[in-house]
Amino acid sequence: MTVLKMTDLDLKGKRVLIREDLNVPVKDGQVQSDARIKAALPTLKLALEKGAAVMVCSHLGRPTEGEFSAENSLKPVAEYLSKALGREVPLLADYLDGVEVKAGDLVLFENVRFNKGEKKNADELAQKYAALCDVFVMDAFGTAHRAEGSTHGVARFAKVAAAGPLLAAELDALGKALGNPARPMAAIVAGSKVSTKLDVLNSLAGICDQLIVGGGIANTFLAAAGHKVGKSLYEADLVETAKAIAAKVKVPLPVDVVVAKEFAESAVATVKAIAEVADDDMILDIGPQTAAQFAELLKTSKTILWNGPVGVFEFDQFGEGTRTLANAIADSAAFSIAGGGDTLAAIDKYGIAERISYISTGGGAFLEFVEGKVLPAVEILEQRAKG
């Protein structure tokens, strides 16, 4: 994968437009979770150090396109950036017809989704973005799977289009895990439904040596192996699909599980052997014996890809399985990559962020890359690099 990289470019005195993913939760005008902004800061600082006139753009939320809405304004993000960078970061609402930014200064453009044609990737809007800059930098992996004006269109028309450090690191890490992984490779794919992760499961079945499944997905695989799953969430119509996947790759199944009679924070957790699951039981986590077996498997792996907690870890009594596996991944010498919103929440909860080799910031983009799909915003950077 060959793309121009921002780190290799001379940006002194250049007008540089950087697309970041600053789509953060905001409540009462305050940023609630700053992970995405923190991830973007090194790129912004580097562009300033290189002497560029820096313009930053992003979307936030899902406003009606073409209309301003205060709740989706990037104002709280501009205020956060001002504090984080120790300088005033002006928020510019009217920028499409040109702005004055001096070298060494940084401005934030208002939500790109307030512009008509952003989501449709309209040429006219993309050309306006491109006219603002000498260099366009795509640094928002989380939106790379969408062909929109500020992620794809602008890269078609800009004089120079490059990948930012965050995007480049993400592509390198995913390429390392999926392109030519050190073996043995284990993947953990968990979630409520096989149907939503079907392409991921099929893709990984052709790459990894062990495919650990969790959550509702595991229940469908258990049913496919002839086990009773009680009133647990599973997909009867995908039992044959689960069998086909299990025929292609080793899918170790739980030998014991944690069950409850109801899905609630107050539910009483009971550990049972898989053969003892009753008709009115709901499987909400893997059992301790299974967790220990899976942990051993992870410790001997050389590459680990993790997407999804294996139990309802939000309730502590159903979180032991996820905690055990999270710690096993953290303790492993393997190259480990983790992605997906729930996975990141589990990493936070168990305090292991520093011990995972790479944490992906992109939810949908991460999954689409794992599925082997082309990410439009990356594809256009590759095309531009070829000239």
From Swiss-Prot:
GO terms for biological process: gluconeogenesis; glycolytic process. Keywords: ATP-binding, Cytoplasm, Glycolysis, Kinase, Nucleotide-binding, Transferase. It catalyses: (2R)-3-phosphoglycerate + ATP = (2R)-3-phospho-glyceroyl phosphate + ADP. GO terms for molecular function: ADP binding; ATP binding; phosphoglycerate kinase activity. Substrate binds at D21, L22, N23, R36, H59, L60, G61, R62, R113, R146. ATP binds at K197, E314, G340, G341, D342, T343. It is an enzyme of class 2 (transferase). Pathway: Carbohydrate degradation; glycolysis; pyruvate from D-glyceraldehyde 3-phosphate: step 2/5. It comes from the Bacteria. Its EC number is 2.7.2.3. One of its GO terms (cellular component) is cytosol. It is found in: Cytoplasm. Monomer. HAMAP family: Phosphoglyc_kinase. Belongs to the phosphoglycerate kinase family. This is Phosphoglycerate kinase. It comes from Pseudomonas aeruginosa (strain ATCC 15692 / DSM 22644 / CIP 104116 / JCM 14847 / LMG 12228 / 1C / PRS 101 / PAO1). The gene is pgk.
